[in-house]
Amino acid sequence: MQMAYWVMVMMMVGITAPLSEGRKLNDAIRGLVPNDLTPQLLQSLVSRRHRVFHLDNTYLKIPICAWKVCPPTPWRRRDLKKRNK
């Protein structure tokens, strides 16, 4: 949690520091994005997050956790049922 806090603080500093020098907000935000970021590269980064894994002859999507508590994956539930038998 502390890491997320410091990342947020550093991003705020990275945006507000150029503003104090008279730059526009749009230019400051664009300065945080790499110059070689193309729509194709951005699409590949986004699509890479949604991987499909093959497990027990079924295709299961791995949930992407945006919060601290993630929902259990389907095969974990199945493994728990097998263990309890």
From Swiss-Prot:
It is found in: Secreted. Residues 23-61, 76-85 form a propeptide. GO terms for molecular function: toxin activity. Transmembrane segments: none annotated. Residues 1-22 form the signal peptide. The keyword Amino-acid biosynthesis does not apply. Disulfide bonds join 65-70. Coiled coil: none annotated. Its main location: secreted. The keyword Repeat does not apply. Expressed by the venom duct. Keywords: Cleavage on pair of basic residues, Disulfide bond, G-protein coupled receptor impairing toxin, Neurotoxin, Secreted, Signal, Toxin. One of its GO terms (cellular component) is extracellular region. Acts as an agonist of neurotensin receptors. It binds to human neurotensin type 1 receptor (NTSR1), rat neurotensin types 1 and 2 receptors (NTSR1/NTSR2) and mouse neurotensin type 3 receptor (SORT1). The cysteine framework is C-C. Belongs to the conotoxin C superfamily. This is Contulakin-Lt2. It comes from Conus litteratus.
